[in-house]
């Protein structure tokens, strides 16, 4: 097999692998990591995510509080529980208001081309109600622009 055929085969295999990736992102603090977080990761995988990226706050979390557990240990817990990549949310966003926290995390997620899904948990579990609330918030944001 000549070089161009080897290159074509490698390119073809790479494209096939990339098109089969269905990566999901989770915005997290894992402060501390608990069974509910593990369940969320398991459910994200069960819903078809082939890869999971967690955007996680570092040693300081929302409200400028120090994290209960070191960021490296929290990242390791996430990796052992099924997350494939942990990306640290920079301090200015990690310690900001909920809106800025989320906005910073989403900006990071949008910079990762393979991520197609945002996986999140909720206390209500009512997807329709959450979707309607998101629509209202989106409409208000558009009107303000």
Model-derived regions: residue spans:
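Nucleotidyltransferase catalytic core that binds NTPs
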Residues: 1-145
């Amino acid at each position: 097999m000549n070089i161009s055929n080897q290159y074509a085969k490698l390119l073809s295999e790479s494209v096939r692998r990339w098109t089969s990736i269905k990566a999901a992102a989770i915005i997290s603090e894992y402060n501390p990591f608990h069974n509910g977080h593990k369940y969320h990761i398991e459910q994200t995988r069960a819903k078809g995510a082939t890869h999971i990226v967690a955007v996680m706050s570092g040693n300081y979390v929302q409200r400028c509080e120090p994290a209960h557990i070191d960021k490296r240990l929290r990242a390791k817990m996430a990796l052992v529980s099924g997350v494939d990549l942990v990306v640290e949310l920079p301090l200015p966003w990690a310690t900001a208001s909920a809106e800025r926290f989320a906005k910073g995390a989403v900006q990071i997620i949008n910079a990762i081309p393979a991520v197609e899904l945002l996986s999140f948990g909720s206390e209500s579990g009512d997807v329709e109600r959450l979707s309607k609330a998101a629509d209202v918030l989106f409409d208000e944001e558009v009107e303000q622009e």
